[in-house]
Amino acid sequence: MEHSTIAAIATAPGAGGIAVVRLSGPESYAVAAKVFHPANPAKRVEEAKGYTALFGHFMEGEEAFDEGVALFFRAPHSYTGEDVVELSCHGGSAVARRLVESCIAAGAAPAAPGEYTRRAFLNGKLGLTQAEAVMDLISADGRQGAALANASLNGALAKKIGAEKDALTALQAHLTAWVDFPEEDVPALEDAQLVSTLTTVKGELDTLIRNYDAGAVLREGVDCAIVGRPNAGKSTLLNLLAGFDRAIVTPVAGTTRDVVEQAVRLGDIRLNLFDTAGLRETEDAIEAEGIRRSWKKLDEAGLILAVFDGSAPLTREDLALAQRCAGRPAIALVNKEDKPTQFDAEIIAGDFAMVLPVCCQEEGSRRVIAAAVARLLGTNNIDPHAASLSGQRQLAAATRARDAVAGALDAVSGGFGLDAVSVCVDDALDALCDLTGENASENVINEVFERFCVGK
């Protein structure tokens, strides 16, 4: 690990009330003393106690170019576990950049992306799952997603995995003693005891894996295709969900010829909406290309909102769309419920998770759709304060552990002997150690921290 003192802007770029430049490393106080002069000449930066603040001026040589506050943190009681000084200057890129340049001229090195959190991990201040949660919390733009990240940052996932590891470790100790030291008269484990422990662990891992997709939706959002025949109300729906006139709406069929994109927040879920061209047979080459893109977006989407005209009978295009949505996370929206209904929803009901009568011009339908989307994607069943998996790395490790425990259960039921059970339990423990970062290679650590921005 590099033990140099590093400096970087820790706040988002652009104009703002303040900007923070963070120093971390053994020379943080010495560097700060060169670039920050307390307003009270009796105060010395080098002698500042942890968890204290001083007001003063930021210096480049003999020139004071700004005034602000320095916050001091003594090792190991800091984010990184090192001496840390946070220098708060006026916001805007010019002043903050000049302050960083002054710190570098005074002996600090520029921080790499994620280097502060990487040092926190290497110094034992955070586990790997907690470090990953830092990035999730920074990226969160919904309350539930932020709560999930905060729970992991506070150790919810590490504690949950730790409990399953403890159960398997105790089981493995007994298995090892019985297999390796038969002369010691170690009592054999009863199959019922083995099955009970393994089943409990497998159930906990199954729950984590089952909830992964809903957690990912809350953290990352989901791509949502709005599809249907021309003039069914797709663009009106886009405008309703967006809260403003994002797409052009006219009585002319085929107004939308290309995909119109808009990110919206529906309840606590971020939807990346794709309003698509109306699905119909056409001789127009441009419209045909738009329709091809519509089908492509439908196939790629994590959520489908299929819009049907409730004031007209089902058509061949409607039936083709319903068949294409079968088995997918799709909701049928029978639009124009304010008009006499000619649409037989029962014919398509089996192809959709749910069928909802709506009026895409009314705000009440927005609330109905939001509740249905949350129910379909499972986000309303998530406890935001519970342990949850984040990212493919964690999911893959948890899945390997679950499959190994399932293999141990198969070994018990198949009568393959305790040696076979022990091998499977070992594999499960290795996978759980990979998840928590105890077995993490340098490549894995690099992959985790390359997602971070400079300054965190």
Predicted regions and their residues:
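Switch I (G2) and immediately adjacent beta-strands of P-loop GTPase domains
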Residues: F55-F65, A70-R74, G254-T282, E300
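Short glycine-/small-residue-rich Rossmann-like dinucleotide-binding loops
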Residues: A242, A277-G278, G302, D309, ...
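Inter-motif core of Ras-like GTPase G domains
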Residues: E287-S311
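Generic enzyme active-site microenvironment
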Residues: L273, V307, L333
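C-terminal-of-GTPase-core extension/linker across diverse P-loop GTPases
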Residues: E2-I9, P13, R143-R265, T282-D284, ...
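A glycine-rich (often HGG/GG-containing) alpha/beta subdomain
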Residues: M1-A147, A151, G155, I331
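Short, Asp-centered acidic motifs that coordinate Mg2+ and/or phosphate
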Residues: L271, L303, I331
